[in-house]
């Protein structure tokens, strides 16, 4: 992928990802947030979190199935945008829904299961976003980083469960998210099993790599940064 094409893809991701936020801001200023504005904002932000998180998790399966390299360039960006919307979703719940009533929020977390799993999903996303840079991968260590980022599927599962419990009966939307997540996890497990069963080829020289998605197991790594080539590589001298 050339530098210009990469910029186009990333610009498209930014525009598509920030579009829901723009819709909410416009609705706020035009007083078009329905009869229950807080509920509308909360649901819109939560829906966007799941869309972006599943989009990020789908990048590696796309590479596995179609041998495309470009999805990997967008994986980390999509994951961080999902975390951004999760922060907004959580902030609205704290500030607008509960008006910083910490005691009432704590009671809701303990007594209402859909809130419990939603908070757990958000908490799991925090260390993933915090360790999404190349520098943090080196500091944490490859094996530890892979184990940590396996939590992305747990966060996705809890997020889908949060949506399933919250949604009204008869609405198929949450089930679509659950199916997509199950398919993505199944593809990663299939790829992991395929590599485990493949015969190992003796290599004349052992190579060391930075850990990445598709290298070393079923790790989702929605927040995995792209590997950059050093300057001058590939140039004809």
Task: Describe the function of each predicted region.
Residues 1-223, 228, 234-237:
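Membrane-embedded alpha-helical bundles that constitute the cytochrome b-like, heme-associated redox core
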């Amino acid at each position: 992928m050339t530098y210009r094409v990469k910029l186009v893809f990333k610009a498209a991701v930014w525009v598509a990802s920030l579009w829901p936020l723009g819709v909410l801001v416009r609705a706020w200023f035009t007083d078009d947030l329905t009869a229950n504005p807080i509920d509308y904002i909360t649901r819109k932000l939560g829906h966007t979190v799941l869309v972006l998180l599943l989009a990020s998790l789908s990048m590696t399966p796309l590479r596995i199935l179609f041998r495309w390299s470009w999805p990997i360039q967008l994986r980390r960006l999509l994951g961080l945008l999902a975390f951004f919307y999760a922060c907004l979703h959580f902030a609205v719940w704290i500030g607008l829904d509960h008006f910083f009533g910490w005691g009432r929020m704590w009671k809701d977390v303990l007594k209402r299961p859909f809130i419990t799993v939603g908070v757990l999903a958000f908490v799991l996303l925090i260390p993933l976003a915090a360790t999404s840079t190349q520098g943090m991968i080196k500091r944490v260590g490859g094996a530890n980083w892979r184990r940590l980022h396996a939590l992305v599927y747990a966060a996705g599962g809890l997020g889908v469960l949060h949506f399933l419990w919250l949604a009204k009966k008869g609405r198929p939307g949450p089930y679509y998210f659950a199916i997509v997540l199950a398919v993505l996890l199944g593809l990663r497990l299939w790829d992991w099993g395929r590599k485990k069963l493949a015969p190992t080829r003796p290599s004349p020289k052992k190579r060391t790599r930075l850990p990445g998605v598709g290298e070393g197991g079923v790790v989702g790594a929605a927040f995995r940064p792209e590997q950059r080539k050093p300057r001058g590589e590939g140039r004809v001298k």
